[in-house]
Amino acid sequence: MKTLLLTLVVVTIVCLDLGYTRICFNHQSSQPQTTKTCSPGESSCYHKQWSDFRGTIIERGCGCPTVKPGINLSCCESEVCNN
């Protein structure tokens, strides 16, 4: 009986998602580096870059958003990969 209970506990731990979350950079342009713990279910980070009257703008964060034409977007799926 103890063996069965132990087996069930191990199977439960292995099968459950134990709350792993991605960590991405989220600083903008030339600001000091900061990171953010992404929401559950967000498994990627993004690096978005475009130019306007202010110069080159860089935005970083969690997820992989859709962008308008003229905006360079790169998405990645490892820890703090969007620098």
Swiss-Prot record:
Expressed by the venom gland. GO terms for molecular function: acetylcholine receptor inhibitor activity; ion channel regulator activity; toxin activity. The record marks 27, 30, 46, 53, 55 as: Moderately important residue for binding to acetylcholine receptor. Pfam families: Toxin_cobra-type (PF21947). Gene3D superfamilies: CD59 (2.10.60.10). It is found in: Secreted. Keywords: Acetylcholine receptor inhibiting toxin, Disulfide bond, Ion channel impairing toxin, Neurotoxin, Postsynaptic neurotoxin, Secreted, Signal, Toxin. Disulfide bonds join 24-45, 38-62, 64-75, 76-81. Residues 39-44 are annotated as: Stretch between loop I and loop II. It comes from the Eukaryota. Residues 64-75 are annotated as: Loop III. InterPro entries: Snake_3FTx, Snake_toxin-like_sf, Snake_toxin_con_site, Toxin_cobra-type. Binds to muscle nicotinic acetylcholine receptor (nAChR) and inhibit acetylcholine from binding to the receptor, thereby impairing neuromuscular transmission. Binds to Torpedo marmorata nAChR (Kd=0.14 nM). Belongs to the three-finger toxin family. Short-chain subfamily. Type I alpha-neurotoxin sub-subfamily. This is Erabutoxin c. The lineage of its organism: Eukaryota, Metazoa, Chordata, Craniata, Vertebrata.
